[in-house]
């Protein structure tokens, strides 16, 4: 596609602006967490959590922003595909970090061994599946079967984390029961997004 003749479309521009604001917000939030940490492990973990999400998403959102203004090219298409792979892995790490945040927030609770195994096993399996070349991340075809498998395992990881926050409930006055709904919504939206990324061509 000739960049000189490409005319950006308004929906693409609006999406690009939203993506840029989202990444900037995450970046600032992560920096604030680290600045306020003062050696407190919980704040450090929240900073790592935020920057993990921001950093992973940046790998596929930045190419999308470029595509919105310059059109699609083989290089941008490849970067978007690779970015989706990276963000799939970092989103899995996001849930594992939430496990450690739960442990620090509620030291009086012990994670059931079965739930912890469930979280770790599903996270490792998902990352392993994400690394398979058969995913065809950088092609329009993708791999619907592996996409379903990835997101199915991802749902298991999310359910494991939700169980932990349901167990702790409102202990300590943190009102962490709301985390259950937040994680559920995040899991559903993430799953829908990545299924869409397989169904809708990258270019």
Each predicted region: which residue ranges?
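Alpha-helical membrane segments in multi-pass integral membrane proteins
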Residues: 118-124, 143-199
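Hydrophobic transmembrane alpha-helical segments in integral membrane proteins
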Residues: 2-26
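Membrane-interfacial loop-to-transmembrane alpha-helix junctions, especially the N-terminal start
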Residues: 39-51, 76-79, 110-118, 175-182, ...
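Juxtamembrane "helix-exit" motif on the non-cytosolic side of transmembrane helices
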Residues: 33-38, 66-69, 101-106, 129-140, ...
């Amino acid at each position: 596609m000739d960049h000189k003749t490409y005319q950006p479309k308004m929906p693409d521009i609006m999406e690009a602006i939203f993506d840029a604001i989202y990444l900037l917000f995450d970046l600032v939030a992560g920096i604030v967490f680290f600045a306020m940490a003062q050696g407190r492990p919980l704040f450090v973990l929240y900073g790592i959590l935020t920057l993990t999400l921001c950093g992973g998403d940046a790998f596929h959102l930045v190419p999308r922003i470029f595509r919105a203004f310059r059109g699609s090219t083989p290089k941008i298409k490849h970067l978007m595909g690779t970015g989706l792979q990276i963000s799939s892995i970092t989103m899995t790490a996001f849930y594992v970090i939430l496990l450690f945040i739960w442990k620090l927030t509620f030291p009086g609770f012990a994670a059931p061994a079965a739930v912890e195994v469930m979280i770790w096993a599903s996270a490792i399996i998902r990352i392993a599946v994400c690394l398979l070349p058969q995913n065809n991340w950088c092609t329009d075809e993708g791999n619907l079967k592996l996409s379903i498998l990835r997101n199915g395992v991802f749902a298991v990881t999310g359910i494991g984390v939700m169980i932990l926050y349901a167990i702790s409930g409102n202990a300590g006055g943190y009102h962490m029961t709301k985390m259950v709904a937040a994680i559920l919504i995040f899991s559903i939206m993430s799953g829908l997004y990545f299924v869409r990324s397989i169904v809708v061509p990258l270019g």
